[in-house]
Amino acid sequence: DINASMDKYLTEGVFQVLPESLVYIERQQSDGRIRHGLIGMVDLDAYDFTPGSGALIRATEGTVLDRIPPRARVRRNAPIELPHVMLLIDDPDKTVIEPLTAASGEMETLYDFDLMQNGGHIRGYKLTDRQVDAVADALEGLTSDEAMQKKYGVSGVAPLLFAVGDGNHSLATA
């Protein structure tokens, strides 16, 4: 039973709570290419899947409302919730992720292991408080009127910070 497995993981201390943290990820694919990203949390009130929404976090595909109740039922009695949601940013000046790549040596390594089935290798690093603040500032900069004008040639419109690239229904269920 999946809930029993979750309880077991919680009891055994498999998971570590990292309040107010961000985790920088480097995933080396089996072909040698490295993908970079961040793991964190978002304000669910900043998300809206309604077409034409002006929310900071928006869906990139239609949300099928019938898919939400089954997902909610599965999660109802779950002791933990760990859905994957991939959020995309439009950061042409490389202000968010790239500074972290150069500074990963300053971060605490949380994990570093090979993935199964030739999936490559993954490393996760906990950002310092200073780096978390820098990421927050960089993300805020992406929503400025100046940034919207530079990227899209528009101003005075509701900025888009994150586009949901995968996991839209999981985010809608949350």
Q: Can you say where each PLM-predicted feature lies in the sequence?
A:
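Short, contiguous, pocket-lining structural segments
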Residues: P79, L127, Q131, F162-H169
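Active-site beta-strand/loop microenvironment that shapes enzyme catalytic pockets
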Residues: G141-A174
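Glycine-rich phosphate-binding "P-loop"
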Residues: M116-D137
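N-terminal extension/subdomain marker
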Residues: D1-N118, K126, Q149-Y152
